[in-house]
């Protein structure tokens, strides 16, 4: 994802790769950029590069080497370089092996690590049986969705089914997705990929690259050749990251996006090598009922950075507290 983004998206020309390696393998990789403001605070720092389509900032860390030593070495080199007083990594997983190794390195060598309050996003852990929908949605709602699928089939004259458009070659599916996304409200708001210079090229290059590696999911809810909704996701190891979704607003009353979400869960369960699905979205989709905690990690690289990290973390906590109070009052 990094190379297509750097070639086609804003800020790519100012992005650097922070990496650690040996003569024969990569140990650590994180795209970064120099920043002069962070979360509204004037502060020079080094930050993970989070473009518009990057939903996880966790660095790549070798699974075959000691991650605590890797983190300690990276922090030590950055401190010696004195390039910035602070490294900020946004959208980092709060748990997991990479975060655990960083906290262990913090405990062992005193990195003075700080963390923002975590936010939750929709996630799915594999179940022994495909009970994802029945665990999170009542039977009456599921029956209503099944009825809508049957109604669509009758109206359109063909069964409504989901097709894996990435299997055996994309065959124009990328352009179909771009057209579908640009046909609705995203065109009106200017946020469709086709409406933003270079963004459609980024999507084409990314999708084709992942497809060539057998790591692209592009499921299409269709009635015959009529596309009702499409969903893309990226395979990474034992996980699946949700990416872009679109639906035909002419059929919104039949909830084609939700019908496709149900089929995505079935597709996920039928892939035994996959252990989890990160939707990379908020927690407002009942079908995806598990949660993943995401936070910003602040790694000081100097005495001034230690002070700045503490103040910035306190500011982020205060903002979250005030936002939570406003949300409770408006509920």
Regions found by a protein language model. Name each.
Residues 74-75, 135-143, 311-318:
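Short intrinsically disordered coil segments
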Residues 76-79, 133-137, 225, 267-268, ...:
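A general structural signal for short secondary-structure boundary/capping elements
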Residues 21, 37-117, 234-299:
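Acyl-donor binding region in acyl/amide transferases
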Residues 295-331:
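Membrane-proximal basic amphipathic "stem/tether" segments
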Residues 61-64, 124-127, 165, 301:
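Short beta-strand-to-loop capping motifs
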Residues 49-50, 59-64, 118-123, 151-156, ...:
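Short C-terminal domain-edge/linker segments immediately following a structured domain
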Residues 1-48, 90-121, 127-253:
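A conserved beta-strand-loop-helix scaffold within acyl/acetyltransferase catalytic domains
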